């Protein structure tokens, strides 16, 4: 058959993260990759932190180019929203650069229907039960820990480049 040789200058970060796997799967194993390190070059990079309920998760931090930071932050928070299971309280997922939050989403709380046993039209009783539930959720959020599943750590590496 015919052979094609393509030569590119590309950041090493792009090669390391999933490029080789994608090349093999796209070509069904026929393509090969040969590379050599050319030079160091300065770039405008920032550290993208992931906060879950206000706590930094160092294992999920990324170093990204400043131009792509907002996009990667949004992508990371949306992916975590899919992977973190629902809790009894709202879970805030934020992407931050330094102290500045650039993307935010939240996993909604599971809710029990506290009004199921209230029949009739006593609105004040219903409101009291809902307020009591709301206060309990607030207390839970202060002491609650969120377990980050193992798939979340692998998903960070598989974000679309």
UniProtKB/Swiss-Prot annotation:
Entry keyword DNA-binding: no
SS bond list: none
One biological process term in Gene Ontology: translation
Database matches in InterPro entries: EF-4 (IPR006297), EFG_III/V (IPR035647), EFG_V-like (IPR000640), LepA_C_sf (IPR038363), LepA_CTD (IPR013842)
SUPFAM superfamilies for this protein: EF-G C-terminal domain-like
Main subcellular location: membrane
Membrane topology according to the record: Peripheral membrane protein
Pfam families xref list: EFG_C (PF00679), LepA_C (PF06421)
Catalytic activity: GTP + H2O = GDP + phosphate + H(+)
Keywords: Cell membrane, GTP-binding, Hydrolase, Membrane, Nucleotide-binding, Protein biosynthesis
EC number: 3.6.5.n1
EC main group: hydrolase
Gene Ontology CC terms, in alphabetical order: plasma membrane
Keyword Hydrolase: yes
Domain of life: Bacteria
Entry's localization field: Cell membrane
GO molecular function: GTP binding; GTPase activity; ribosome binding
Family designation: Belongs to the GTP-binding elongation factor family. LepA subfamily.
UniProt function note: Required for accurate and efficient protein synthesis under certain stress conditions. May act as a fidelity factor of the translation reaction, by catalyzing a one-codon backward translocation of tRNAs on improperly translocated ribosomes. Back-translocation proceeds from a post-translocation (POST) complex to a pre-translocation (PRE) complex, thus giving elongation factor G a second chance to translocate the tRNAs correctly. Binds to ribosomes in a GTP-dependent manner.
PANTHER family noted in UniProt: TRANSLATION FACTOR GUF1 HOMOLOG, CHLOROPLASTIC, TRANSLATION FACTOR GUF1-RELATED
Name the record gives this protein: Elongation factor 4
Origin species: Pseudomonas fluorescens
């Amino acid at each position: 058959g015919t052979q094609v040789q393509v030569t590119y200058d590309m950041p090493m970060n792009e090669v390391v993260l999933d490029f080789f796997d994608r090349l093999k799967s796209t070509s069904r194993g026929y393509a090969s990759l040969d590379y050599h390190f050319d030079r160091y070059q300065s770039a405008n990079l920032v550290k993208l932190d992931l906060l879950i309920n206000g706590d930094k998760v160092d294992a999920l931090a990324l170093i990204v180019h400043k131009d792509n930071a907002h996009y990667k932050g949004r992508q990371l928070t949306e992916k975590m929203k899919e992977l973190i299971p629902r809790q009894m309280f709202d879970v805030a997922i934020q992407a931050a650069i330094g102290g500045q939050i650039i993307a935010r989403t939240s996993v909604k709380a599971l809710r029990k229907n506290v009004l199921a046993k209230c029949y009739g039209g006593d609105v004040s009783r219903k409101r009291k039960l809902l307020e009591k539930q709301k206060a309990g959720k607030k207390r839970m959020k202060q002491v609650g820990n969120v377990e980050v599943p193992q798939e979340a750590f692998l998903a960070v590496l598989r974000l679309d480049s």
